[in-house]
Amino acid sequence: MSRTVFCQHLNKEADGLDFQLYPGELGKKIFDNISKEAWTEWQKKQTMLINEKKLNMMEPTARNFLETQMQAYLFEGKEPDIEGYVPPKS
């Protein structure tokens, strides 16, 4: 049986993550407050950011940038600036 959380990103009840996917306090906050659906959306954005900005994930500055973008997207509702990407119209 899956666990349900009130997803802060989607503002609705949804299936929660099966386990903590990110380390530390931020990882706990994500596990407790973000749904599988929102996490999957973030992973797509993350991949586009890494590719578009040519981030080297071995560099601490790149990891810090990505973490800041992740927090803004998941908890503040801010879309990351991905050059050349036009979101689909609803």
UniProtKB/Swiss-Prot annotation:
Pfam families in alphabetical order: Iron_traffic
MF annotations from Gene Ontology: iron ion binding
GO biological process: cellular response to oxidative stress
Keyword list, A-Z: Iron
GO cellular component annotations of the record: cytosol
Alphabetized InterPro entries for the sequence: Fe_traffick_prot_YggX, Fe_traffick_prot_YggX_sf
Function per UniProt: Could be a mediator in iron transactions between iron acquisition and iron-requiring processes, such as synthesis and/or repair of Fe-S clusters in biosynthetic enzymes.
Protein family membership: Belongs to the Fe(2+)-trafficking protein family.
PANTHER family: FE(2+)-TRAFFICKING PROTEIN-RELATED
Protein name as catalogued: Probable Fe(2+)-trafficking protein
